[in-house]
């Protein structure tokens, strides 16, 4: 089984993927053992990161080799945002059929066509601005995704401009619970079944307050009709995992608040099941969000 050591520059530049109204770049990683009708994970990097740096830190391509997963890495251009952040708070980049979400949708369509992806097994994850853009994709193109994982992110449409975004990141204000539900439902005509949701956040995150994690959970609790306290709480790698199950007993939402962790993606680089490398915003805390997210989605079985 692979360890945390991964080679650099593992990704392949994606040359063509539609009209690209959001003016994004894209990279892919298709493992040699990728099967026909295999799954696809869309991975969205955070601010000041690149597709390659996030892949290296998170270890997604190592897990892809292990489990036969195709990866798509949308990448922001500095001409769009000087910090390389996805523009999740701009109205033109948070609507179906427009801007960055449409670019990402076009990338997905191209990868599905090029590599015979199973359209029922497409997933999306991201950290920080990539986590917030994950919320955007889950709301604006819900028919595309079987699951989403939001790391150190924010709820869909919690902010509509940069000033609001900065305030929300600090944990202040934001839509009511009723409005959080309505924002997702108004983003498309989709009526379900909805993606399962995995939420990860540092308990000591001073960049994006972990109140946002709870808001994300509440947004999707209403969509999945699982309001109220978690169905159960269990311990995984020493951290509490809260789980909400629907009426059929399916786990539809999980939440991890990693005590003592700051802003970033939780990784476990060492050991037989280690993935990734510690770096800025890639935080060694003894639990691999990458591996556990993939397991939640049924990709490690």
Report the location of each language-model feature.
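Short beta-strand/loop motif that positions the catalytic acidic residue
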Residues: 199-201, 205
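Conserved alpha/beta-hydrolase "acid-adjacent" motif
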Residues: 207-212, 266-267
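A conserved short beta-strand
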Residues: 144-155
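Cap/lid segment of the alpha/beta-hydrolase catalytic domain
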Residues: 75-99, 161-162
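Structural cue for short, hydrophobic secondary-structure segments
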Residues: 43-46, 73, 199, 257
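Active-site glycine-rich loops that stabilize anionic/oxyanionic intermediates
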Residues: 46-50, 261
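Alpha/beta-hydrolase active-site loop
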Residues: 92-115, 136
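A domain-start/cap signature at the N-terminus of enzymes
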Residues: 1-40, 52-70, 96-99, 119-121, ...
């Amino acid at each position: 089984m692979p360890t945390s050591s991964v080679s650099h520059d593992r990704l392949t530049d994606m040359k063509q993927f539609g009209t690209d109204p959001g003016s994004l770049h894209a990279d892919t990683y298709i493992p040699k053992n990728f099967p026909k009708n295999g799954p696809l994970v869309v991975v969205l990097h955070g601010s000041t990161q690149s597709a390659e740096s996030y892949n290296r830190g998170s270890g997604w391509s190592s897990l892809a080799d292990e489990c036969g997963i195709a990866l798509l890495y949308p990448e922001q251009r500095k001409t769009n945002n000087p910090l390389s952040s996805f523009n999740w708070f701009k109205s033109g980049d948070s609507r179906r059929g427009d801007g960055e979400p449409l670019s990402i949708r076009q990338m997905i369509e191209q990868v599905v066509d090029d590599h015979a992806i199973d359209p029922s097994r497409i997933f999306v994850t991201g950290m920080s601005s990539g986590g917030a853009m994950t919320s955007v994709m889950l709301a604006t193109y819900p028919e595309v995704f079987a699951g989403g994982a939001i790391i150190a992110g924010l709820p869909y449409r919690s902010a509509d401009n940069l000033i609001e975004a900065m305030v929300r990141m600090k944990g202040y204000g934001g839509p009511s619970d009723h409005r959080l539900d309505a924002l997702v439902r108004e983003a498309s005509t989709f009526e379900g079944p909805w993606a399962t949701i995995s939420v990860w956040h540092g308990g000591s995150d001073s960049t994006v307050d972990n109140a946002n994690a709870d808001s994300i959970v509440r947004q999707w609790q209403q969509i999945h009709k699982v309001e109220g306290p978690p169905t159960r709480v269990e311990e995984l790698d020493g951290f509490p995992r809260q789980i909400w199950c629907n009426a059929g007993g399916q786990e539809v939402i999980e939440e991890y608040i990693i005590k003592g962790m700051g802003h970033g993606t939780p990784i476990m680089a060492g050991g037989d099941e280690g993935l990734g490398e510690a770096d800025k915003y890639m935080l060694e805390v003894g639990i691999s969000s990458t591996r556990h997210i993939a397991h939640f989605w049924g990709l490690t079985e």
